[in-house]
Amino acid sequence: MEIQRALVITGIAVVSYLMIQAWQRDYANTASPVPVEQVAEQGNSSSSDSADLPSVQSQTDNSIPSAQSDNDLPSVSPADIAQPTPSSQRIEVNTDVLRVEINPVGGDIVRLALPDYPKHVDTPDQPFVLMDQNSNGTYVAQSGLVGKNGTDSSKGRPHWNSAQQSYRLAEGDNELNVDLTLTQDSGAEIIKRYTFEKGSYLIRVSHIVRNNGSTPWTGALYGQIKRDGRDDPGLSKAGFAPMPTYLGAAYWSADKPYNKLTFDDMSEDDVKLDQTVEGGWLAMVQHYFVSAWIPDAKQKNHYSSVYLKSRDQYLLRFVSPNTTIQPGEESVLYSEFYAGPKQQDNLEAISPGLNMTVDYGWLWFISQPIFALLVFLQSGEVSVFGMDIDIGGGVGNWGVAIILLTLIIKAIFFKLSATSYRSMAKMRKVAPEMQRIKEQNKNDKQKQQMETMNLFKREKINPLGGCLPMLVQMPVFIALYYVLLESVELRQAPFFLWINDLSVMDPYFVLPILMGASMFLQTRLNPTPADPTQAQVMKWMPMIFAVFMLWFPAGLVLYWLTNNILSIAQQWIITRNIENSA
């Protein structure tokens, strides 16, 4: 029995240790943040923004790019060079799922809000702001043309012209184009076009170059995400103990589908990104949401990262190969930009591997089918090759779906659990005999162990049979933890009564208290350990776990509570049958 109890305690300790290690390895950002400098809402001076721009002449230079040579400077007139502009001149774009603001200086996305995802469950009319540039910090998407005839350089960035100050996707329309225009001294006309689609968080960014000049036009497309090192504004907070999630960069490459690049990595010269990738994507990942550049999949683009130490800003960028356009010809340099929720099916359809930004950790192969089953129970939909098929029968409530999922998991492990509870019941039945053996041979440990093993053999008891089945189920619990923590579908998902968000802690601690009470009842069905120390540990374990669960997502505690109730019922029936047997 001591072996059994020791293994149970060891299993709990190992699981807790692995969870803490996973948090620290994958999610913790231990770098001390540098105070963010005051940033004007529109990126005030041309020099401050241009210092962040990539250089096609020296793509291996991972420091802040220097000015290019004179003959490589862009052919923009002084009037086109960026000047400070008031925030009122931002171009506003509204679709059914996006609220976007574009700065004419550079044509950058400097604010992006998601009306379908409120900032707080109690303020449904206040959308979550994913990207923004203001005095509190910077998180923007930049793009442009660099090179000999590019629009962006160390000299500054262009001021794009727009026919309208505000754009809105009209009801009944499926697409909205926002055109920013620029004419270079060489005669080249450039249109920077943002294309928004109904119901989509994917934005097509096209640079249409019409070479009306007399000489070839040469340039390259770049796109980058610039973000400061502040905390994730969308982080789920639970009292004084926020649930930690990954905050940092990620990218796709052919040799490794999913690569994390933490902010600490980006600040180190020997770790930062610097490679050529065919297709792929670069992303800034945070809790529930992601922003990502998806370059032309047919091109080999140069991926790099830069850390601006003085401003505590991190840049993740790509630069395409040079494009040459002959006089009288036209060409389109394009990429795509995604900014929105981490919806797995949508992300997979956009670019291979982008759905991996929903980080289920090292047990992803268990988490993914659990999530698929949970979605089916809630909505009645199944995903086949990226297509959602509505079979019907969904319960329409994520909390009820979690309860049904628990029933299914419990049914799968029914026999294993029965083996465990049967072993525990037998141990409880022979506990008086074990105590007698211990007292009779308290001075002879070897004889005590021998007689105890003979007792186990005679009663057909496996001392490990009670704990090993429990340990087998632990990976499922950890995988479900990641599902409930990472899946944006459960963000602000209500259950019943006081629980209006299953992704955060129970505000009144009702579920953790009930979970602790259920654990206490379950321990009463187990044999009391002979060792006083182990007995004390098992006595206080329900309270310790109840306190530990106070700050866990309510959905996870609901799963554990439901599982405990089912386990108690199963164990009570098995224990009663064995104790009543001859």
UniProtKB/Swiss-Prot annotation:
Signal peptide (from-to): none
Keyword line: Cell inner membrane, Cell membrane, Chaperone, Membrane, Protein transport, Transmembrane, Transmembrane helix, Transport
Pfam families assigned: 60KD_IMP (PF02096), YidC_periplas (PF14849)
UniProt main location, coarse: membrane
Membrane-crossing residue ranges in chain numbering: 3-23, 357-377, 394-414, 464-484, 495-515, 541-561
Membrane topology recorded in Swiss-Prot or TrEMBL: Multi-pass membrane protein
Region annotation Disordered: where it falls in the sequence: 38-92
Cellular component terms per the entry's GO annotation: plasma membrane
The keyword Transport appears for this protein: yes
Composition skew (Polar residues), residue ranges: 59-74
Source species, domain of life: Bacteria
A GO MF label: membrane insertase activity
Subcellular location: Cell inner membrane
GO biological process, one term: protein insertion into membrane
Ranges of Low complexity composition bias in the record: 45-58
NCBIfam families assigned: PRK01318.1-3, yidC_nterm, yidC_oxa1_cterm
Described purpose of this protein according to its UniProt entry: Required for the insertion and/or proper folding and/or complex formation of integral membrane proteins into the membrane. Involved in integration of membrane proteins that insert both dependently and independently of the Sec translocase complex, as well as at least some lipoproteins. Aids folding of multispanning membrane proteins.
Family as reported in the entry's similarity comment: Belongs to the OXA1/ALB3/YidC family. Type 1 subfamily.
Subunit structure: Interacts with the Sec translocase complex via SecD. Specifically interacts with transmembrane segments of nascent integral membrane proteins during membrane integration.
Protein name per its UniProtKB record: Membrane protein insertase YidC
Species of provenance: Alcanivorax borkumensis (strain ATCC 700651 / DSM 11573 / NCIMB 13689 / SK2)
Gene: yidC
